[in-house]
Amino acid sequence: MNLSRRDFMKANAALAAASVAGLIIPVKNVNAADTSITWDKAVCRFCGTGCAVLVGTKDGRVVASQGDPDAEVNRGLNCIKGYFLPKIMYGKDRLTHPMLRMKNGQYDKEGEFTPVTWDFAFKTMAEKFKSALKAKGPNGVGMFTSGQSTIFEGVAKSKLFKAGLLSNNIDPNARHCMASAAVAFVRTFGIDEPMGCYDDIEHADAFVLWGSNMAEMHPILWSRISDRRLANPDTVSVNVLSTFEHRSFELADLGILLKPQSDLAILNYIANYLIENNAINREFIEKHTKFKRGETDIGYGLRPQDPREQTAKNVKTAGKMYDSSFEEFKKLVAPYTLEKAHEISGVPKEQLEKLAKLYADPNKKVVSYWTMGINQHTRGVWANHLIYNIHLLTGKISLPGCGPFSLTGQPSACGTAREVGTFIHRLPADLVVIKPEHRKIAEKIWKLPEGLISDKLGFHAVAQSRALKDGKMQVLWQMCNNNMQAGPNINEETYPGWRNPDNFIVVSDPYPTVSALSADLILPTAMWVEKEGAYGNAERRTQFWRQQVKAPGEAKSDLWQLVEFSKYFTTDEVWPAEILAKNPAYQGKTLYEVLYLNGQVNQYSNDELKGRLNDEAYHFGFYIQKGLFEEYASFGRGHGHDLADFDTYHKARGLRWPVVDGKETLWRYREGYDPYVKAGEGVSFYGQADKRAVILAVPYEPPAEVPDRKYDLWLTTGRILEHWHTGSMTRRVPELHRSFPNNLVWMNPNDAKKRGLKHGDKIKVISRRGEITSYIDTRGRNKCPEGLIYTTFFDAGQLANKLILDATDPISKETDFKKCAVKVVKA
């Protein structure tokens, strides 16, 4: 299929029109032409929306896909990436054998990539792991994992590192995108993830998008919002806030352009407006909330020697919250007047007031959506809190059409990274490694000796790169992501650690990405429906799929790699002698035996597969996915994180947890919807001991880096519709690659003119950390205000993240990809 950009955009417009009209693409239109195709359900491989698809296979290959008409999320529709899903697996450069850098028949850091056996690869890895553990301790080895890993893979990773190698040095790329949301959810409500669901869309009167371009990043949800808005033009509004104008502005009734970081001031202004105009829900506040004050002047998560960290007063207590009161909260937000918010944000006063009145209207049901504009922020945790504040002050929460809703960018950032707990500090179901009682629960469920799991935190994502560079960490295994392209400040902080001659880097990937080619060992990985899988999407919906085709060559799933690798270690090599002395039954056993042959994971027979494909189950001799899932699910059942039984998910189109007595939960914390809220309670934020949600007072604070005379422009980065993240999958789809082959830099025409530039010119974008060569766009879909440029990071030929400052939120440790200073010159 040869699709021009014009045809591509027309096709996408037609798809959007079908969405707005509420049409469903019937199955018979897609598969009637070839009855020899076998169809089964799966989940889209891309964003966190969680669209369900039907996958068509023939002669051992995926040959077609279509939206699943029985799926509640997408109702038979898929975005343009979803329609090209079959092609992501068949790039010409697909990896099919383990590849190790070798010279003269042995591993050499400067050697050429050479095919090796899996056994040779694992023996080399195990030797490096054991050496690093001996030299540097548990944090000498680490894993950088992903919100794209399946739930089963996430469980296996967490067990291998936290229960096997006794290292909490495992962190996901969700640290770069969802950590601020997760931290703020837990701090506010005591439990992670949104209380609402996508059904809010059909109930809301107003949608407010904070730093979210849903039209391109969550197009299927946007189609539902468009349908709601266009069907009710007199009663429903769409309101969009961003630092530049993008496609979501096309539907906006109120489109607001704000200065970078000023969202904090705007949100505090709205809270002040609500109080000053008596638009708060006093009864709700008194019954269901409590007030706290946050620490201020907390730094920017940079290296300790950075002057910005040296001058910050409260770096070490960044996450501290102090008991407060409504009166103190009122006093702290009082300075954020209309005039002050306008001064900081640059937003016209009438727009600010209109937005505040929208939240204040007691008859308006409002949903606030946000993604990376709020989360990828040096004060991302604060920004999340401030959105919650507005909904808690008005009581517009945990009701159909009312609530704060953080949208995820990866298919299982929620289900795997957050719910399973593949962060350095987490265990399943919101348990954390620093609490002894939580570690004890994990040890009991995993059948481990008491006192085995460590309370020592590992290095978070950005800190892993620094630790490799500094020699504090010697081995990294990266799975299911491309951090050498996606991470921040890659020239100064990431690449040096990877090529440090004392370090050993392993990358598991289906393709020779920038990360893979920078590694020492590449492990070829099975993709998507080449394995049985499960994802958890942004609305707490857990969805399963079965393996439908086999991976090419010797490529193996991440699950197979993790579990097989565990056979190369014994407890005597990695567990403390004193624990083994007290628990002699564990002595001399492999980690495979104690983690995966523990009587729980291996209790389900392969007979249950009834002959279906499942490479991992047949290799290990038991239904490993079912065993891992049921063991993991026991963490949350009866504790507000209830999952249904394994077999139910293979029959259903997903269920939103908590699932109690076979029934999913659409809105949490509200009586009548949530089984954990008792009769008569009305609302119960039961994640908190006192069942009260936190309203937090925190101020506006400036960004870590701002434009100056030398670097006179803001740079913000993100994605576009046609490509996903680093493009390692979408750029291998010919139609998607042709539609948008290379990255561009969007710039205001006046800024271009001042620099003697015009549309289409070749330019250099230069920051204090690096530079890229690209082309300028002054006419396209993204319209930047003067003083700001926008670019994407999908293009491996440009590596835009060389420009990015590795500043993070000091509480969540999430990177700010949205704000740094650059200059633009003609190339």
Curated annotation (Swiss-Prot):
Q: Which cofactor does it need?
A: [4Fe-4S] cluster; Mo-bis(molybdopterin guanine dinucleotide)
Supply the enzyme class, top level. oxidoreductase
One Pfam family of this chain: Molybdopterin
Which GO cellular component does the record give, naming just one?
nitrate reductase complex
- Please tell me where substrate binds in this chain: F793
The alphabetical list of record keywords is:
4Fe-4S, Electron transport, Iron, Iron-sulfur, Metal-binding, Molybdenum, Nitrate assimilation, Oxidoreductase, Periplasm, Signal, Transport
What's the name of the protein? Periplasmic nitrate reductase
Which species expresses this protein natively?
Histophilus somni (strain 2336)
| Gene name as annotated | napA
